[in-house]
């Protein structure tokens, strides 16, 4: 499988916002992004970084993909998290996830994320989970780049 990555394109931000139901107003103006393009040139996934707090070293991310597309590869994960931890120099990545998305929560747990349950985050009947990944937890994971492991 051949994937290509594009950085900083507004098309990626629109793509991600359209695929996530709770992003009804888009993302803040000071966002960053990585788009994932397949061999035919079609955008199949995207990652948006927003609410970057440089002082505290935190950044929030949102990711979305077309259904049935294999995009969450080791290389994509490495690029996404190295961007946050190396380029942005963050010490923590934060992702909000619907409580019923057990598959994604399972994947994030395997990466070493810690979780905070947030009742009603997505409305009266829909809970959310704040998923927190520190640079130390990522550095301990085999998918991290050598740069991240050396810095930890």
In which residue ranges do the predicted regions lie?
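A conserved beta-strand-loop-helix scaffold within acyl/acetyltransferase catalytic domains
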Residues: 26-30, 39, 44-56
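Conserved glycine-rich acetyl-CoA-binding loop
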Residues: 66-78
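Conserved catalytic-core motifs of GNAT/GCN5-like acyltransferases
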Residues: 96, 114-129
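Conserved acetyl-CoA binding element of GNAT-fold acetyltransferases
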Residues: 55-68, 96
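Conserved GNAT acetyl-CoA-binding A-motif
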Residues: 86-97
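Short amphipathic alpha-helix that is part of the acyltransferase structural core
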Residues: 1-24
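Conserved active-site alpha-helix within GNAT-family acetyltransferase domains
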Residues: 100-117
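C-terminal "cap" of GNAT-fold acetyltransferases
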Residues: 122-152
């Amino acid at each position: 499988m051949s994937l290509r990555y594009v950085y900083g394109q507004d098309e990626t931000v629109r793509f991600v916002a359209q695929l996530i139901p709770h992003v009804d107003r888009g993302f803040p103006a000071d966002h960053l992004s990585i788009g994932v393009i397949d061999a035919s040139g079609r955008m199949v996934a995207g990652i948006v970084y927003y609410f970057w707090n440089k002082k505290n070293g935190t950044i929030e991310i949102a990711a979305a993909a077309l259904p049935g597309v294999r995009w969450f590869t080791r290389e994509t994960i490495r690029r996404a998290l190295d961007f946050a931890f190396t380029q942005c120099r963050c010490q923590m990545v934060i992702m909000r996830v619907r409580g019923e998305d057990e598959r994604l929560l399972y994947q994030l747990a395997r990466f070493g994320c810690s979780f905070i349950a947030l009742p009603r985050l997505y409305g009266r009947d829909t809970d959310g989970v704040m998923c927190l990944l520190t640079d130390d937890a990522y550095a301990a994971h085999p998918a991290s780049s050598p740069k991240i492991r050396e810095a930890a």
